[in-house]
Design a protein with these regions (language model features):
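Short, well-ordered beta-strand segments in beta-rich or mixed alpha/beta enzyme
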Residues: 2-9, 39-72
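Absolute protein N-terminus
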Residues: 1-2, 100
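Short, surface-exposed ligand-recognition loops at beta-strand->loop->(often short) alpha-helix junctions
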Residues: 10-18
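An amphipathic, aromatic/His-enriched active-site/gating alpha helix that lines ligand/cofactor pockets
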Residues: 21-39, 58-95
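Short, solvent-exposed coil/turn elements at secondary-structure transition points
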Residues: 44, 97-100
Length: 100
């Protein structure tokens, strides 16, 4: 099992728009079996910059994660939801952990 985190540092005041988009994505991801354990988190305090959003999910294998990611990102509905999201994000990264 693996834990994947997509971490985005949003522009000031734009984290709400990204939360809205991720919530719109969830039903589409669920259609392909991708969001069993997915959750959206935002920063409260600590080492991350303000306006940080984290999308976290577990996957049984990295191959399955990559296949489902390709499948959802080729969906025109997903493309419409994510259109222009770079206007809301300053930077980001992906973290992948093996669950022991």
């Amino acid at each position: 099992m693996y834990l994947v985190r997509e971490i985005m540092h949003c522009k000031p005041g734009k984290v709400g728009e990204m939360i809205k988009r991720f919530k719109q994505m969830q039903p589409l991801m669920k259609e392909v079996g991708m969001t069993e354990s997915a959750r959206i988190m935002t920063d409260m305090a600590g080492g991350e910059p303000f306006w940080t959003l984290v999308w976290e999910q577990e996957t049984p294998s990295l191959e399955k994660y990559l296949d489902l990611t390709r499948q959802t990102m080729s969906d025109p509905r997903m493309q419409k939801i994510m259109e222009g999201y770079h206007d809301f994000v300053e930077s980001g990264r992906r973290e992948i952990y093996k669950v022991e």
